[in-house]
């Protein structure tokens, strides 16, 4: 592994303070920022994603923000391709990349590589799977997967809709189970980089308080109006990856129903809060699984992280 191409990975659950920390590092050294967030890639989705404002992006430019519309799909494979191109370009200019975000699948793909010969997503195959789910229910789709790929059935739950879709998509295209292909196929790992991995893992109670504060601010500054504007501008539906983002899923469901009473609005806000907490829980799980394989330095507080990283990088 070459020591000539260092890459700083700054990870953490939602609302942990990682973006603010990355911006502070940016000010102190010869760095550039790359967003590792599957929601920030979407244009016009600003409030619900806690996207850095235009003013903040002018001060701290982020790559891989606002690159597609909410109608488009962005995969982990595309992220790795884009991120590696940016990393190489930054190093050619003498910059050190800081990758910051909470989409752990993207970090995992960058650190461990992706199976190189799996088929690309097929919109028609996916539409057929989603149509079956709409007509027969997700249990029927899950049962189909278990029948052709029992190992995937052990790994996935019925609620893992995107993973089920991908596994069935691969089987319908190739005729082979995705678990078999993943075990057999080589992975493309960017060995030319030296990754320096850092993770913010604050106390759960503190994180839950930060999440509540973020969502409260989100409602106050017009998140529902933002989703209404999205509905007017785009032909949205709940199956789009963009609309499966926490907050947007609950808001879209609320706005598309006839009953928009205060009671239903409160229920929607409660669902969004619960979904965000569940997201943070999954991010913790992902981080801990990555830590079992890769070298990490973890911090329990933002203050601790700032002091240590200042000493290391500025």
Swiss-Prot record:
GO terms for biological process: tRNA modification. The keyword ATP-binding applies. Substrate binds at residues 14-19. Its cofactor is Mg(2+). The keyword Membrane does not apply. Gene3D superfamilies: 1.10.20.140, P-loop containing nucleotide triphosphate hydrolases (3.40.50.300). InterPro entries: Dimethylallyltransferase, IPT, P-loop_NTPase. The record marks 103, 126 as: Interaction with substrate tRNA. It is an enzyme of class 2 (transferase). Its EC number is 2.5.1.75. ATP binds at residues 12-19. It catalyses: adenosine(37) in tRNA + dimethylallyl diphosphate = N(6)-dimethylallyladenosine(37) in tRNA + diphosphate. One of its GO terms (molecular function) is ATP binding. It comes from the Bacteria. Residues 37-40, 162-166 are annotated as: Interaction with substrate tRNA. Keywords: ATP-binding, Magnesium, Nucleotide-binding, Transferase, tRNA processing. Belongs to the IPP transferase family. Monomer. Catalyzes the transfer of a dimethylallyl group onto the adenine at position 37 in tRNAs that read codons beginning with uridine, leading to the formation of N6-(dimethylallyl)adenosine (i(6)A). This is tRNA dimethylallyltransferase. The lineage of its organism: Bacteria, Pseudomonadati, Pseudomonadota, Gammaproteobacteria, Moraxellales.
